[in-house]
Design a protein with these regions (language model features):
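N-terminal ligand-binding lobe of clamshell/alpha-beta domains
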Residues: 1-247
Length: 247
C-alpha cells in the first residue's frame, strides 16, 4: 500500500525518506529535521495533538530513546515504523525497509544498493592505498565532550569502512566515556569531533586544550555525518576516508 502522508519524528528517518525521493510525502517533522514542514514537537517530546491534526498514515521513529514514544503511538492507533540500528549493516537495512514501509520498495532497494556501491568504492580505494604501503591509521571519534565520550553504535563500523582502526568501543555498543589514560594508551593518529547537536560549530581546541600527551590530526565533522543513521553516514564515511588517506 502506498503511503502518502508521513510524519517523521526522527531526523534520520526524514533524511532517509528524502534520499529515497519521498520528501513530498512527508507532512510533518520535528524541530530537528531538515525538511521545511510543519513541526510536531521535538525528538523526545512530540506534540501528539499537532500530530493528530496532520492525519498521518505512517509515523516514523528511531532509536531506543524513542521506544516509549513508539509504544504510545501504537496505543493511539497509528501505523508506525520504528528502527533501532546499532551497526552499519542495520543502517543499510533501514535504507531499504523504511521506504518499503511507505509503499516504495523499489526506491528503498535502490537507496541501499547505491549506498553499498559507494562503500565498495571506498573500500577499493583504501585497499589500493594499503597495497602502495600506507598504514591503517588509528582513529578516535568524539561525540560528546563533557565528559569526553568515544562514539559507539555504528561509528566503529564506519571508521573501519573508511579504512581506520577504532579500539575504543566495540561495534554495536553504546558510546563510552574515555579518559587521559585510555587516549594516551592508544595514541590515535586522528581525532574526529562530531559533537551531538553542534553541527560543525566546534573548535579543534577541544582536543588541543586537554592535557593529553598525544598529537593526533584533529578534524571537525558536522555531527550528522557520523551520528545520524541515514544516508548522511555514507557521506561521512567517504569524507573520513579521504582524511585518513589524502591524495
Amino acid at each position: 500500500m502506498t503511503v502518502s502522508r508521513i510524519i517523521s519524528l526522527a531526523p534520520s528517518a526524514t533524511a532517509t525518506l528524502a534520499a529515497a525521493g519521498l520528501a513530498e510525502r512527508v507532512v510533518g517533522v520535528t524541530a530537528h529535521c531538515e525538511l521545511d514542514r510543519p513541526t510536531v514537537g521535538g525528538w523526545l517530546n512530540p506534540d501528539y495533538e499537532g500530530l493528530a491534526e496532520l492525519s498521518p498514515e505512517l509515523v516514523c521513529t528511531s532509536d531506543s530513546l524513542q521506544g516509549e514514544i513508539h509504544e504510545e503511538l501504537k496505543a493511539r492507533g497509528y501505523n508506525t515504523f520504528h528502527h533501532e540500528p546499532s551497526r552499519l549493516t542495520d543502517v543499510l537495512e533501514g535504507f531499504e525497509s523504511l521506504p518499503k514501509a511507505a509503499g516504495a520498495a523499489a526506491a528503498g532497494r535502490e537507496l541501499r544498493e547505491s549506498a553499498e556501491r559507494r562503500l565498495t568504492a571506498v573500500d577499493e580505494r583504501v585497499e589500493a592505498r594499503l597495497a602502495e604501503g600506507a598504514s591503517r591509521p588509528t582513529v578516535y571519534c568524539e561525540e560528546w565532550s563533557d565528559p569526553p565520550m568515544a562514539a559507539g553504535n555504528w561509528v566503529p563500523d564506519a571508521v573501519e569502512a573508511a579504512g581506520g582502526r577504532y579500539p575504543f568501543v566495540t561495534p554495536g555498543e553504546r558510546s563510552q566515556e574515555v579518559d587521559r589514560e585510555i587516549i594516551e594508551g592508544v595514541d590515535p593518529d586522528h581525532a574526529v569531533l562530531h559533537i551531538c547537536g553542534t553541527g560543525s560549530q566546534v573548535s579543534v581546541d577541544r582536543i588541543h586544550n586537554r592535557e593529553w600527551a598525544v598529537e593526533p590530526a584533529v578534524h571537525v565533522f558536522d555531527d550528522s555525518l557520523l551520528n545520524q543513521p541515514s544516508p548522511h553516514l555514507i557521506r561521512g564515511i567517504e569524507q573520513l576516508s579521504r582524511r585518513l588517506y589524502p591524495e
